[in-house]
């Protein structure tokens, strides 16, 4: 693995020079190996080690290099045709492959090769980009998008129209992470490497990036970039010091433990705010 990483790191330093016509065979093979391991879940861009998320930047660099190495090509689809650098994850799938994968894909969901879909995942008509990791039992609802290299935990519900930001455009240092057992309400956007802690509930229409103020109603504390585990979050506003205007923020209205979260419906948690 160290040798593979070295090839990727060295090539990334001269990425501006790389084209589909001059890419070395060794580099092309190395990047393809990384993409295939991402596709099968043997590698992931970020993983939790000793309770902390660790980002493997070299894997993200391999994903970025794949765009430099490939020309657009014709991609045949069931309802249309496409022209892109990255093939569909399911381009060569048979019915047995789908059964072995243990997930369900509703047309016209689009999933790029190099993303991992675990068992018992349901993909409604949605989009999952390269490098993403979608763990067991998660629902990606209609028109939801899972951005490049985003990490989605177990038993997560991404409601209709949810946007989970990627790392490729614009380039971000860390992927957006939604931990286990989270509910993300319809049309919410979580981007720019924000981490949503496990067992959290994000209400409908909440937008959180790295510059979004996250206000804890109980403590009065303002933080950025991370939602603590067990948080119930709604959209809100904070007044300016001069009182002449207010700016958008995300408000943590309560925090619940995993036991309460498992016994309480989403509507109940949001209704009593």
UniProtKB/Swiss-Prot annotation:
Binding positions (substrate): 104, 141
GO CC terms in record: cytoplasm
EC number: 2.3.1.117
Reactions the enzyme catalyzes: (S)-2,3,4,5-tetrahydrodipicolinate + succinyl-CoA + H2O = (S)-2-succinylamino-6-oxoheptanedioate + CoA
UniProt-annotated location(s): Cytoplasm
GO molecular function terms listed in the Swiss-Prot or TrEMBL record: 2,3,4,5-tetrahydropyridine-2,6-dicarboxylate N-succinyltransferase activity; nucleotidyltransferase activity
Top EC category: transferase
Source species, domain of life: Bacteria
UniProt keyword terms in alphabetical order: Acyltransferase, Amino-acid biosynthesis, Cytoplasm, Diaminopimelate biosynthesis, Lysine biosynthesis, Repeat, Transferase
Claim: Repeat is one of the keywords in the record: yes
Primary location: cytoplasm
Gene3D superfamilies tied to this protein: Hexapeptide repeat proteins, Tetrahydrodipicolinate-N-succinyltransferase, N-terminal domain
Biological processes per GO annotation: diaminopimelate biosynthetic process; lysine biosynthetic process via diaminopimelate
Pathway the protein acts in: Amino-acid biosynthesis; L-lysine biosynthesis via DAP pathway; LL-2,6-diaminopimelate from (S)-tetrahydrodipicolinate (succinylase route): step 1/3
Subunit structure: Homotrimer.
Stated family: Belongs to the transferase hexapeptide repeat family.
Stated name of the protein: 2,3,4,5-tetrahydropyridine-2,6-dicarboxylate N-succinyltransferase
